[in-house]
Amino acid sequence: MNTTPDTPTPRALRELTPLEARILGVLVEKQHTVPDTYPLSLNALTAGCNQKTARAPVMNVSEDEVTTALDELKRLSLVMEGSSSRVPRFEHNMNRVLGIPSQAIALLTILLLRGPQTAAELRLNSARLHGFADISSVEAFLDELAARAQPLVVRLPRAPGARENRWMHLMCGDVNMADFASADAGGGADSVPPSEFEALKAEQKRLADEVARLNALVQRMASELGIDVDAPGDAS
């Protein structure tokens, strides 16, 4: 999966702080999921950083902390501040600075927001950012990110009993493989990776929201037709 000819040349970057990495992930995510409110205000960006779903780890940061991190990201050209609104709004510039295509940005974003993921989890969790045809295409982009002169992701040791390796971003620096190997071994074959658990919780919430939406639709249609859906059925 080679980058397209118009993909900008990547720049060497310093290691990011966890909050700086979270901010980038939130900006990319919201660009795709709530485009009407993107670029994001400081308030919306802080809320996205502190979001309790689809985040690992969960953070609790202030607007002052986010502002400080934004200043650093602007110095690195990773974030740009718009000037067309009375309220300052922020957008990411990852594709140009990192020199990677949108597919790779989508995968990197999920790793920034949710922590280590398998290729299958990445395909599921990145669906709203980019629709990958299959797991092989996900792995191809991951392999490219890992093979760069300054790698952006790394394949972690496979946990005992696990069928797939997990991947982790390197935007905050290198990881100690031995730490992950020992942590995975201590979890046992029956343990569920946190990223997989988060994916299951997110899917459960999505299904619950869909059921609630359909129930509200049925109630509205029944009301328009004069039908009491809560009344007991005719037993005759």
Swiss-Prot record:
Pfam family, one: DUF480
Signal peptide range in chain numbering: none
Gene3D superfamilies on file: Winged helix-like DNA-binding domain superfamily/Winged helix DNA-binding domain
InterPro entries tied to this protein: DUF480, WH-like_DNA-bd_sf, WH_DNA-bd_sf
SUPFAM superfamilies in UniProt: Winged helix' DNA-binding domain
Similarity-based family: Belongs to the UPF0502 family.
Record HAMAP family: UPF0502 (MF_01584)
Protein name, entry field: UPF0502 protein Bcen2424_5610
Annotated source species: Burkholderia cenocepacia (strain HI2424)
